[in-house]
Amino acid sequence: MQICLMDETGATDGALSVLAARWGLEHDEDNPMALVMTPQHLELRKRDEPKLGGIFVDFVGGAMAHRRKFGGGRGEAVAKAVGIKGDYLPDVVDATAGLGRDAFVLASVGCRVRMLERNPVVAALLDDGLTRGYADADIGGWLQERLQLIHASSLTALTDITPRPQVVYLDPMFPHRQKSALVKKEMRVFQSLVGPDLDADGLLEPARQLATKRVVVKRPDYAPPLADVATPNAIVTKGHRFDIYAGTPLTE
């Protein structure tokens, strides 16, 4: 994959070349998207809209830390949707990990989550965030136990994952309404990189085959159900819907 690669660390240790080789990235000087190594973290920038700033994954501070400390925890819609109840903390595969926010919420309340991400740039951002998170004195211990990254296409990986999870979580990128308020700056940068999930409909069936209990699909409230498969089971929040589908129980 081609992207502009930049190193702002001041180091001459070749870390950028190692990063490019690991994730299969090629430097393209003219690409409007840039992956930048800063002294603090790895970040994604949209060079033709510098005011949008850089996007990076931070499990330790910022919004994630606030959500972990002061958010709804088990009461969050995503936690309810995957079925957390009492001692039941399902094993989850997040097949469209993105920047890892929902996966982190589930891990923070006790679920083991395997994140799948097919875009190599996004996977690199997630890996950088996990590396810093694993090293953190406060959350590193449980984060290493509960949150892991698999860099693979969900369409292929969903048929190969073992052991099978109880829940598969899907949050495919959906085209935003043109008339809606300006999409959050982060989403604009993100969508410029990955675009809409045009093959997302193909995820539902393999997800249902993989999950032993349920599949949860997060959708904007105006979006049709994934693959046009309606379900009466959903948790509805302001602006979103968590559609719930039955999985395929384990056979004895």
From Swiss-Prot:
Pfam families: SAM_MT. GO terms for molecular function: 16S rRNA (guanine(1516)-N(2))-methyltransferase activity. S-adenosyl-L-methionine binds at residues 101-102, 117-118, 153-154, 171. It catalyses: guanosine(1516) in 16S rRNA + S-adenosyl-L-methionine = N(2)-methylguanosine(1516) in 16S rRNA + S-adenosyl-L-homocysteine + H(+). It is found in: Cytoplasm. One of its GO terms (biological process) is rRNA base methylation. Keywords: Cytoplasm, Methyltransferase, rRNA processing, S-adenosyl-L-methionine, Transferase. The keyword Cytoplasm applies. Its EC number is 2.1.1.242. Its main location: cytoplasm. One of its GO terms (cellular component) is cytoplasm. The keyword Transferase applies. PANTHER family: RIBOSOMAL RNA SMALL SUBUNIT METHYLTRANSFERASE J. Specifically methylates the guanosine in position 1516 of 16S rRNA. Belongs to the methyltransferase superfamily. RsmJ family. This is Ribosomal RNA small subunit methyltransferase J. It comes from Salmonella typhimurium (strain LT2 / SGSC1412 / ATCC 700720). The lineage of its organism: Bacteria, Pseudomonadati, Pseudomonadota, Gammaproteobacteria, Enterobacterales.
